[in-house]
Amino acid sequence: MIKILYEGFSLVELIIVMVLIGILAAVAVPKMGNTITSGEEASENGVLAALESAVEMYAMDQVVSNSSRRYPYNPFDHMEKTPQGYSGENSVLDEDGEWTFENGQWIAHQRNDNSRYKWSYDSNTGQFGDRVAY
């Protein structure tokens, strides 16, 4: 008599593997979301640092040329390279990754998840405020 061997996985084994994959995915997805948020915050911090540097360089140039410390109205105008997504002054944030300078006092950014943040900017003192969701 010939023995027939069935090779492969049983239905129970396949279900157990699917459950384990589901558990791993449930743990990994929230951590991945936190990583994306952290990356966007780091990118925003980099842009703000570049803006602060551009504002200070402008102020130092003003001291040298005019003997008075003045700050630019729009800090984006004096950056070496504007950030990707900068759409100009007083534009509507309607695209992911977009930056704008609003009403002469706010720097605004829309993240890829459509959340929006802004920082105050005082052109009299060159000071930037903290990140605020809006």
PLM segments and residue spans:
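Extracellular/periplasmic head regions of type IV pilus-like filament subunits
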Residues: M60-Y117
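Conserved interaction-surface patches within small, structured recognition/assembly domains
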Residues: N34-G39, R70-P72
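N-terminal single-pass transmembrane signal-anchor helix
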Residues: K3-T35
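Membrane-proximal N-terminal amphipathic helix
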Residues: G39-S65
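Short helix-capping and hinge/turn segments at secondary-structure transitions, especially at repeat
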Residues: V29, N34-T37, E56, M60, ...
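Low-complexity, S/T/G/P-rich flexible repeat/linker segments used as non-globular hinges
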Residues: R116-Y134
